[in-house]
Design a protein with these regions (language model features):
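Intracellular coupling helices
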Residues: 239-271
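Short extracytoplasmic/periplasmic juxtamembrane "stem" segments immediately C-terminal to an N-terminal membrane anchor
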Residues: 12-28
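Residue-level recognition of transmembrane alpha-helices
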Residues: 207, 226-229, 260
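N-terminal membrane-entry
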Residues: 217-233
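Mid-to-C-terminal secondary-structure elements
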Residues: 35-218
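Alpha-helical transmembrane segments
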Residues: 1-17
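Hydrophobic transmembrane alpha-helices
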Residues: 231-241
């Protein structure tokens, strides 16, 4: 169990979750998200900011029945995981770009474009995907880039084919990347800004790392119980050995006393 937990803790997720905080997009942020993000980026200690649909640690939406350019066969439908994100999502989480480009405001509306992960390109058997199209939900979208695989669920789940679309209006979770060592000051600055938009709503930010740790609560409890039971077993074993040697020593003492009474020499007692 400890080896499993060590593997989970040390495994490369495909992105950097350190010092990423998240909180819900609610209140006035629903209509003024872009303004909030732009202001947040000016706060000392904020390295980048974006938003996404749901928790990065547990993207679970699935869809089937999509078609794409150069599709070999339509007999076996591929299950895709999909997520709606905002600009700067990949930059905020340091997700490596493999080919093409990420979503950018310089290109205007990106609602008809899409980005795939490596797994999606693999199962689609698509060579040189950038510039080709995929039909999602009745709309033909241009593939503008591909990103390296990253874990968006528990480590017990295999990485699935994934597509990412840029629809800021449909995101509901704000992500902010904070410079290490400035957490307290930066969080205070973010809360102050948040209160300017939502004075009556509590600022409830949490670290993304905590979301991932929450995926393994059961394993941690089992590991803790195993530790306690192992300690108890060792103590019981030691007590057993102590009792055994005490009994053996007492028995040997009685034997030596009897042999001395019967006239045994010191040499006889030793050998």
């Amino acid at each position: 169990i400890y080896l499993q937990m060590d593997f989970v803790q040390s495994k490369n997720l495909g992105f950097n979750k350190a010092n990423i905080i998240s909180f819900e997009k609610e209140g006035k942020l629903v209509q003024s998200l872009e303004s909030f993000l732009n202001e947040a980026k000016t706060i000392p200690g904020v390295l980048d900011a974006s938003s996404t649909q749901g928790s990065v640690a547990n993207i679970s939406s699935s869809s089937w029945g999509h078609t794409w350019e150069g599709q070999v066969s339509s007999e076996n439908e591929i299950e895709f995981s999909g997520v709606t994100i905002n600009y700067d999502f990949f930059e905020t989480l340091s997700i490596p770009l493999k080919e093409g480009r990420t979503f950018s405001r310089e290109f205007g509306n990106e609602e008809s474009t899409i980005i795939l992960n490596e797994k999606a390109v693999e199962v689609m058997q698509m060579a040189d995907p950038v510039g080709k199209w995929i039909n999602l939900f009745g709309t033909q979208r241009e593939i503008i880039g591909t990103v390296k695989n990253f874990h968006f669920q528990s480590m017990y789940e295999e990485i699935k084919p994934m597509f990412l679309m840029c629809f800021p209006i449909y995101t509901n979770t704000v992500l902010v990347k904070i410079q290490s060592g400035t957490e307290l000051e930066t969080l205070a600055g973010l809360e102050k800004l948040y209160k300017q938009y939502n004075p009556d709503i509590p600022f409830e930010a949490k670290f993304l790392d905590d979301d991932y740790q929450a995926l393994y609560i059961s394993e941690k409890r089992i590991a803790t119980l195993s530790k306690y039971f192992a300690t108890i077993a060792i103590v019981i074993s030691c007590l057993g050995l102590f009792c055994f040697f005490s009994f053996a020593a007492e028995r040997r003492t009685k034997e030596i006393s009897i042999r001395k009474v019967l006239g045994a020499t010191e040499g006889n007692l030793i050998y």
